[in-house]
Amino acid sequence: MASRGVVGIFLLSALPLLCLELRRGKPDLGIKDLILLCGRIFLLLALLTLIISVTTSWVNSFKPSQVYLKEEEEKNEKRQKLVRKKQQEAQGEKVSRYIENVLKPSQEMKLKKLEERFYQMTGETWKLSNGHKLGGDEDLELDSESQTSFETSNREAAKRRNLPNSVTNISPPAEQPTKKEVLDLPEEPPETAEEVVTVALRCPSGRVLRRRFFKSCSSQVLFDWMMKLGYRTSLYSLSTSFPRRPLEVEAGWSLQDIGITVDTVLNVEEKEQSS
């Protein structure tokens, strides 16, 4: 389009030249001279058109190359950004794996060694072992069970023996009118006293009750204690834990006489129903 416009401009500019040649005062200007003049003009126009077209194409040849270079640069930048992002992610994964698999275990090992050395220096190496609390089962049983099981246990035992309802409605020991059930236990000695043992009663409800006695106390005091807790001797008996056997007492025997010379756990058990 630009070359055509230029050709048109040169054609319009050639008309004045043609008019000037005609006005030079050559009356004998013939057809041959006009043809030569027009040929020169057209030759000049063709030459100019060729020059313009070549110049235009040469100038336009630089534009696509520049656009192509810009596109290539943008693609290269995007590619480099993507590569850098992948490298950063891979490096981050390597760092996290190193921290998790190497650095963290190493720090934990160093800390454990320092802790072991500290306890060895202070003489508290027992803290490095997995210990357990003594008597933990009994304490758990004591905490987990409720305090209201006296009348329930008596009532269930009476039902299994098909006893009348009047027997099951047993009042607390303190309210019993009979002299036998109003029991007075000896005063509990202090822990620092000599010749003292601790007796624990494991009740059917799961409770574990403890009390201190002098070894010289009568063995009958154990059954009095059981009665005061609400377990009648007609329904329940005492037995040792290991070996498991009924506790045998006699009148005039002390706790030391029946073998209770150290801290002991006794079981309150239901008596077997006689046929």
Swiss-Prot record:
Keywords: Endoplasmic reticulum, Membrane, Transmembrane, Transmembrane helix. It is found in: Endoplasmic reticulum membrane. GO terms for biological process: ERAD pathway. Pfam families: UBX. It comes from the Eukaryota. Residues 23-33 are lumenal. Its main location: endoplasmic reticulum. Residues 1, 55-275 are cytoplasmic. It is a multi-pass membrane protein. One of its GO terms (cellular component) is nucleolus. Residues 192-268 form the UBX domain. One of its GO terms (molecular function) is ubiquitin binding. The chain crosses the membrane at residues 2-22, 34-54. Residues 137-181 are annotated as: Disordered. Involved in endoplasmic reticulum-associated degradation (ERAD) for misfolded lumenal proteins, possibly by tethering VCP to the endoplasmic reticulum membrane. May play a role in reproduction. Interacts with SYVN1 and VCP. This is UBX domain-containing protein 8. The lineage of its organism: Eukaryota, Metazoa, Chordata, Craniata, Vertebrata.
